[in-house]
Regions:
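N-terminal amphipathic, basic helical "cap/leader" segment at the start of enzyme domains
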Residues: 1-74, 80-81, 85
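Small-aliphatic-rich amphipathic alpha-helix that forms the alpha element of a beta-alpha
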Residues: 33, 76, 91-118
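Short, conserved acidic/polar surface loops in the N-terminal third of protein domains
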Residues: 86-90
Length: 118
């Protein structure tokens, strides 16, 4: 898939095929997220891949907009580590970049999955 095609055709998916994702494919997708740019190259994230069906069904009790996750082959949770993240204090404000860094990694992850037909 060409980059522009992926950018212009990517969409949010809430209905999933009943088909597992190969471990090698999942590792390639995670690698794409790990190559995302971050503030000062801190890479303040961890990626948790959850494929346990019972746990996925319970996610709806943790986060209210995740009821569709029970039907997914897996869910990747992107966790940001505030200790690793770059931050800057300026006057009376503290600027942190963890949300931006994790959002960029998540977008890379979604585009990599989309490019592989997932």
């Amino acid at each position: 898939m060409e980059l522009m095609e992926g950018l212009l055709t990517r969409r949010s998916v809430r209905k999933y095929q009943d088909k597992p994702i190969e471990r090698e494919t999942m590792m390639e997708i995670i690698k794409a997220a790990q190559y995302s740019p971050t503030a000062h190259n801190r890479q303040p994230w961890e990626f948790l891949v959850i494929d346990d069906r019972e746990f996925l069904a319970e996610l709806r009790h943790i986060q209210r907009w995740t009821s569709f996750a029970k039907d997914a082959a897996c869910v990747v949770i992107v966790c940001g580590d505030t200790e690793k993240s770059f931050s800057r204090s300026k006057e009376d404000e503290k600027w942190t970049f963890i949300d931006v860094d994790c959002a960029i990694a998540t977008e890379n992850l979604m585009l990599a999955a989309w490019a592989r037909g997932i």
